[in-house]
Amino acid sequence: MSSLREEELINILPKDGPTVEEVKKYLEKYNDEFIIIKCGGSVLVDPKLFKVFIEDVVVLKKLGFNPIIVHGGGKRINSKLLEVNIKSNFINGLRVTDKDTINIVEDVLIEFNKEIVEALNELDCKAKRITSKENNIITVVQENKDLGFVGRPTGINKEFLTEIIKANKVPVIAPLGLDKDNQTFNINADTTAGSIAIELKARRLMIISDVEGVLDSEKKLIPEINSKKANELIDQEVISGGMIPKIKNCLDVASNGVKAVVIIDGRKNHSLLFELLSDKGSGTLIRE
């Protein structure tokens, strides 16, 4: 994919990241493909982790990848709702979103989106804001009435998204969408990233979280998993709670044209680079 010389790679890569030899080997395996990166708000609220994440995205761009960022914002939303005395309620991991809540959710996510774009621009990496108010690409229908303004994606504007990428910019996408009446809806960020990955038939969907990956019954990391093994672990309650919908979403994405989904630990330095460009990888790779 990349024709960068060794000295150029040395200048681009972080000293505590994958080696030049590994990167050269893995770059040959990729060919101008899309990498969707969903980063949870729980990781991005930490200033040090935020800085490393931004730097790693810039590295990928310099290496010739087409990274597309979808960000969460749950922790910031919770804090803001607490400030105004609105209680956060969830049904099956989805935030119940009434009229007052959706306005706050939208404001918080748009502000967060702006911060990510500005951080990339500061490192001379051109980025484009995609929110419900600016360059929206996601159409939705209501998930169900009990959840209020929570949407399920029904369409992605693939043409506009590819135009941004052809202009050599990194799309930065907030998990928000509009219905046929231009009403804003909150969308689960994993679902948003999955829908975009499927639409673009991405090479990878990387889900950066504050967990190591999928763990077995002895709390050891499982490096790779398929639908059969995942369903067994769900039946055995080894995979439980909020991890169940996350894994089911990953399996759905992997069975719809995306080569693999990876859950990686954003608390570890350069986990994104190690997963894509090293022998040891990072996290749990999920295939159909």
Curated annotation (Swiss-Prot):
Disulfide bonds: none annotated. Substrate binds at residues 73-74, 95, 186. CDD domains: AAK_NAGK-C. Its EC number is 2.7.2.8. GO terms for cellular component: cytoplasm. Gene3D superfamilies: Acetylglutamate kinase-like (3.40.1160.10). One of its GO terms (biological process) is arginine biosynthetic process via ornithine. The keyword Hydrolase does not apply. It is found in: Cytoplasm. Pathway: Amino-acid biosynthesis; L-arginine biosynthesis; N(2)-acetyl-L-ornithine from L-glutamate: step 2/4. The record marks 38, 246 as: Transition state stabilizer. Keywords: Amino-acid biosynthesis, Arginine biosynthesis, ATP-binding, Cytoplasm, Kinase, Nucleotide-binding, Transferase. InterPro entries: AceGlu_kinase-like_sf, AcgluKinase_fam, ArgB, Asp/Glu/Uridylate_kinase, Glu/AcGlu_kinase, NAGK-C. One of its GO terms (molecular function) is ATP binding. The keyword Cytoplasm applies. Its main location: cytoplasm. It catalyses: N-acetyl-L-glutamate + ATP = N-acetyl-L-glutamyl 5-phosphate + ADP. Catalyzes the ATP-dependent phosphorylation of N-acetyl-L-glutamate. NCBIfam families: argB (TIGR00761). Belongs to the acetylglutamate kinase family. ArgB subfamily. This is Acetylglutamate kinase. It comes from Pelagibacter ubique (strain HTCC1062). The gene is argB.
